[in-house]
Amino acid sequence: MSYFEHIPAIRYEGPQSDNPLAYRHYDRTKRVLGKTLEEHLRIAVCYWHTFVWPGQDVFGQGALRRPWQQPGEPLERARQKADAAFAFFTKLGTPFYTFHDTDVAPEGANLHEYVENFARMVDYLGEHQQASGVRLLWGTANLFSHPRFAAGAATSPNPDAFAWAATQVCHALDATHRLGGENYVLWGGREGYETLLNTDLAREREQLARFLAMVVEHKHRIGFTGALLIEPKPQEPTKHQYDYDVATVHGLLTQYGLQNEIRVNIEANHATLAGHSFHHEIANAFALGVFGSVDANRGDPQNGWDTDQFPNSVEELTLAFYEILRHGGFTTGGMNFDAKVRRQSVDPEDLFHGHIGAIDVLALALERAAVLVENDRLDALRRRRYAQWDSEFGRKILAGGYSLQSLAADALARGVNPQHASGAQERLENIVNQAIYALR
C-alpha cells in the first residue's frame, strides 16, 4: 500500500471551496501576462525536508515515523522513499522536484559505495521521471552533514575533505545533467568559520574559489547547459559563512572572475537571517545580474534561526514576484519549497496541507504582482524620480564627459541649487496595497 494512497489528487476547486485537500487559488492553466500559473511559478518540492527529515530538533529525537525511515536494507529503503516522493509529486501536481545526493541514496561506508549507490538511485529516479513527467529543477550535494565536513568542505584545512567533496559534486552534477536538471546548486553550509582564532580567511577564500572554478570547468566539460547557483546564507551552522548574502556572493564571484558563470538561489529565510528583506535580496540579485532561482519559505521573526516554515504572506511574496515579473520572470529557475512541516505534524495529510496552502499563496501573490506590472504605476513614479539623469547633462556625467574638476567648475559657473523632491513612499505603499487587497 502506498503511503499516500488514501489521499486524492489535489485539484483546483476555486475560492469558495472548503475542501482542505484542494487548491482554492492555484489554477495551473490560468493565464497571467501571457503564461499559465504553472509556467510562471515553476514549483518544486524538495526531497530533504519532505522525505528525509525525521522530525528531530536540538532538544529531541525524530518524531516522524515514515516507513522508509525505519530500519532496513538501505537501498530498498531509498527506493521506497523515491516511490513515496513521486506519488506525492504527482498527487500534488507540481512539475519539479529538488534533491541532495544523500537524500536519494545511502552514503555507504566509503567513496566507492557512495558512487555505486548514487548511480543506482539515479537510474531509479530517471525511471520515475519518465513515468510521471515530473522534472528535476536542480540537484546538489550534501557537503555539511557528515563529521568529515565539520570544518568545511571546500574551505576545510584537510585537502582530503576537499577531495571527497569534489567527488560528491562531480557525481551530483553528472546526475543532475543526466536527469535533465535545469540548475545545479552549491550551498556552503560549513564554508565559513566558528572562530577567527584558528581561521586563515584569505586561504579559505582561495580554496573556495578554486573549488568553484573546478565545478565551472566540469559543467562545461560534460556539456551541462543549466545554471550553476550559489545559495547565500549568513550563518548557521557556522558563525559566519562566506556566502553571507547576494552582495557578498557577487563580490566573491567578481574577485575570482566567476561572475558570468554562477548566479544565486535566494532563500527567503536566509535573507531575513542576513538582516535583509526577501524583496531586497531578489532586487539586488537582478541589479547585479546574478538572479537565478528561489527557495520559498519563511522564518519566525521571534527566532534567530532557520525555521524553514511554509510561506504564508501574500504581501511579502507580491513584492518578490513584482521584481521577478518586471525582469521577465524565471528562466531556468523556479519556486522550490525549502520548507518543512512542524515536528508535531506527523500525519501524511500534513505534508499536503503545508504545500497546498503555500502554493495558493504563491498563486495569489503572483496575480497581484501582475497587476502592479500591468498598471505600471510603480515604475512610472520610479522613472519620474530619475528623469533628470536622462537629460543631456545627466547622460554626459555618466558617459564620462566630465572630470571631477570640470564638473565642479560647471556647478560653480551655473550656480546649481538642487531642490529635493518627494520620494512619495506613502503613495507607493498605497499602490501596492490597492493591488493586493482590491476586490475581485
Swiss-Prot record:
The lineage of its organism: Bacteria, Pseudomonadati, Pseudomonadota, Betaproteobacteria, Burkholderiales. This is Xylose isomerase. It is an enzyme of class 5 (isomerase). Transmembrane segments: none annotated. It is found in: Cytoplasm. It comes from Burkholderia thailandensis (strain ATCC 700388 / DSM 13276 / CCUG 48851 / CIP 106301 / E264). One of its GO terms (cellular component) is cytoplasm. The keyword Magnesium applies. One of its GO terms (molecular function) is xylose isomerase activity. Gene3D superfamilies: Divalent-metal-dependent TIM barrel enzymes (3.20.20.150). PROSITE patterns: XYLOSE_ISOMERASE (PS51415). The gene is xylA. It catalyses: alpha-D-xylose = alpha-D-xylulofuranose. Its main location: cytoplasm. Mg(2+) 2 binds at residues 267, 270, 306, 308. Keywords: Carbohydrate metabolism, Cytoplasm, Isomerase, Magnesium, Metal-binding, Xylose metabolism. The keyword Glycoprotein does not apply. Belongs to the xylose isomerase family. InterPro entries: Xyl_isomerase-like_sf, Xylose_isom_bac, Xylose_isomerase.
